[in-house]
Design a protein with these regions (language model features):
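A conserved pocket-lining segment of Rossmann-fold NAD(P)-dependent short-chain dehydrogenase/reductase
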Residues: 14-18, 45-59, 70-94, 118
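Active-site proximal helix/loop that lines the substrate pocket
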Residues: 2-6, 52-58, 88, 108, ...
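Conserved active-site helix of classical SDR/Rossmann-fold NAD(P)-dependent CH-OH oxidoreductases
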Residues: 28-35, 39, 69-72, 100-101, ...
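C-terminal substrate-binding subdomain of Rossmann-fold SDR/epimerase-dehydratase oxidoreductases
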Residues: 75-197
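Catalytic helix-loop patch of NAD(P)-dependent Rossmann-fold dehydrogenases
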Residues: 2-47, 59, 63
Length: 197
């Protein structure tokens, strides 16, 4: 959902994207390229804008992406969880099992062609909620280090109404359940070294 920037909530696919960082700009550039290829060459496309996806088999050693994995890796190493600002910024954290079925089903679905879809949770949660869920999944008290706030969108979540209209409504995994599943996987595999770039 990085393409949206700080727009109206919930973010909807028909809003004009206003990405604020290189990550969001790059994602939007790919969408524009796909649309141009459709117009010029007849290439069909399907774009998914997933919401803060986390889950088993994720690279938890990447210190720049995915707060759930970062928190788990730190907890397993006895380090505090780094929270930027007050931790009250919200995101719609979405377990991978809530995203993957849409991707699998889209190819055979004619109604999905040449369309952009938001996919993910419609229940925004704070970063502090994530810290609490991770600590609970590991059976520890949350230890948090507050870092200076970053220049980022404070609240980000989007509507999945278009996705539900095309793919149907699906049961979603709660943050707590998803974190428990990922924590069970992480405990089996252990912490990962973090690249210090």
């Amino acid at each position: 959902i990085a393409v949206y920037g700080p727009g109206q909530l919930p973010m909807k696919e028909d809003q004009t994207p206003e990405p604020e960082d290189p990550y969001g700009i790059a994602k939007y550039a790919v969408e524009l390229d796909l649309e141009a290829a459709r117009r010029m060459f007849g290439l069909n496309f399907i774009v998914f804008r997933p919401h803060n996806v986390y889950g088993e088999n994720q690279n938890i050693g990447d210190r720049y992406r995915n707060v759930v994995g970062i928190f788990m890796n730190n907890v397993m190493q006895g380090q505090p969880m780094p929270v930027f600002g007050d931790g009250l910024q919200t995101r719609a954290f979405t377990h991978i099992d809530d995203v993957a079925p849409h991707i699998v089903d889209c190819v055979a679905n004619q109604a999905a062609r040449n369309t952009v879809f938001n996919v993910g949770s419609e229940s925004p949660r704070t970063v502090l909620d994530v810290a609490q869920a991770v600590a609970a999944a590991f059976g520890v008290e949350p230890q948090i280090t507050h870092l200076p706030a970053r220049n980022e969108v404070v609240h980000a979540f989007s509507s999945s109404a278009r996705s539900e209209a095309v793919f149907g409504k699906r049961k979603t995994i709660s943050l707590e359940e998803g974190v428990r599943r990922m924590a069970a996987w992480a405990k089996r595999h252990g912490p990962r070294k973090t690249c210090l770039l």
